[in-house]
Amino acid sequence: MNPNQKIITIGSVSLTIATICFLMQIAILVTTVTLHFKQYECDYPANNQAMPCEPIIIERNITEIVYLTNTTIEKEVCPKLVEYRNWSKPQCKITGFAPFSKDNSIRLSAGGDIWVTREPYVSCDPGKCYQFALGQGTTLDNKHSNDTIHDRTPHRTLLMNELGVPFHLGTRQVCIAWSSSSCHDGKAWLHVCVTGYDKNATASFIYDGRLVDSIGSWSQNILRTQESECVCINGTCTVVMTDGSASGRADTKILFIEEGKIVHTSPLSGSAQHVEECSCYPRYPGVRCICRDNWKGSNRPVVDINVKDYSINSSYVCSGLVGDTPRNNDRSSSSYCQNPNNEKGTHGVKGWAFDDGNDVWMGRTISEDSRSGYETFKVIGGWSTPNSKLQINRQVIVDSDNRSGYSGIFSVEGKSCINRCFYVELIRGREQETRVWWTSNSIVVFCGTSGTYGTGSWPDGADINIMPI
């Protein structure tokens, strides 16, 4: 090959390489521009309906990094379409309950600024669980904590933190309340907050951080609600509220709420004689609640709520191993599904249970007379067979030498089923522990498991002798 041919060959190869590089740069530029403007090609609702843009429910700030030679491309992911929760999955099959969370609020109060609370509960949005409680407007190591045994003051507020985070000074005060309920409909939080005079209280309905509706006392005798989570199905939330005597006939209503607005109110119907402090859970297509009869029965009332036609039915848990405190011993206690058992029915404590086919899972204090200890178990036939007493899978949550308190249910939606969880309020201070002047609580939380589990006891654990007075 002569010198001229070599020059021509080298020039041709160089030109070819230059052309290929030029085309690659054009391809990279086109790819970059295409990915950059891809965010405008998301599928939005056809009727020009605005998409909510709140950080709780919209994931707009996720980036994917793609490397092409030396070019970095950022692609914004389209926002997820937010939908109402419908709770249509089946209930998880469980063998018992496993430990989930404990906040140790009282122990931490010995050396830190922790709120004085009572009436705690837990509820979850689609991505995270939160703990709630009614604060007393003071921390424990504060003279304002004196005499906080009282339930209803204008200083009480609903507190909200991520589950497992004690109520420290930076805790959000959601609303003014001495009785409350909260739930997430899939788009935003609903809070039902009761406060005011005993004879003329107000319930405020706060949705997505805004006050949307309210209702005043209808029987002028301590309007009150669940002290645990409400339930929302396809955008309709239900909450059970009672106004009237705590030891006689009262007026219970079930309110149906859509995005904070009361759309319907149904009176209690069925055979339940007295209903307070219901622990409710989704039982698609409706809602089921296990409540407290503070008048006639130590067996717990059941309230079934039809979300579609607003109809209500009520009865009692069939299990002869009853769930309230005080109660008869297990040999002499009874329940026949339809009526209160008239066994130590006066007084009581908030509690929970849930159906599992014909059986029932339930929790209760170990003591028959006081809020001490806590146990869970399953009663075979306890949902369908009158006075059934065959107990299996018993677990001790708090040993009988330690105090407990209120307890309630909350539901968590998994990939294939809905799990049931519960919390136990661990009360400390007055009236029983008179060395101190305050009354407050911590909580322990368990969730259903299909696996195996061991044994233990999870009391509050604070040494009252080293606590602030």
Curated annotation (Swiss-Prot):
Domain of life of the organism encoding this protein: Viruses
Reaction(s) catalysed by this chain's protein: Hydrolysis of alpha-(2->3)-, alpha-(2->6)-, alpha-(2->8)- glycosidic linkages of terminal sialic acid residues in oligosaccharides, glycoproteins, glycolipids, colominic acid and synthetic substrates
SUPFAM superfamilies, per the entry: Sialidases
Post-translational modification: N-glycosylated.
Reported cofactor(s): Ca(2+)
Membrane topology, as annotated: Single-pass type II membrane protein
Active site, renumbered: 151 (proton donor/acceptor), 406 (nucleophile)
Glycosylation sites: 61, 70, 86, 146, 200, 234, 313, 402
Enzyme class: hydrolase
Disulfide bonds: 92-417, 124-129, 183-230, 232-237, 278-291, 280-289, 318-337, 421-447
Keywords: Calcium, Disulfide bond, Glycoprotein, Glycosidase, Host cell membrane, Host membrane, Hydrolase, Membrane, Metal-binding, Signal-anchor, Transmembrane, Transmembrane helix, Virion
Residues given in the record as Ca(2+) binding sites: 293, 297, 324
Coiled-coil spans in chain: none
EC numbers for this chain: 3.2.1.18
Intravirion compartment residues: 1-9
Subunit structure: Homotetramer.
Protein's name in the database: Neuraminidase
Annotated source species: Influenza A virus (strain A/Swine/Colorado/1/1977 H3N2)
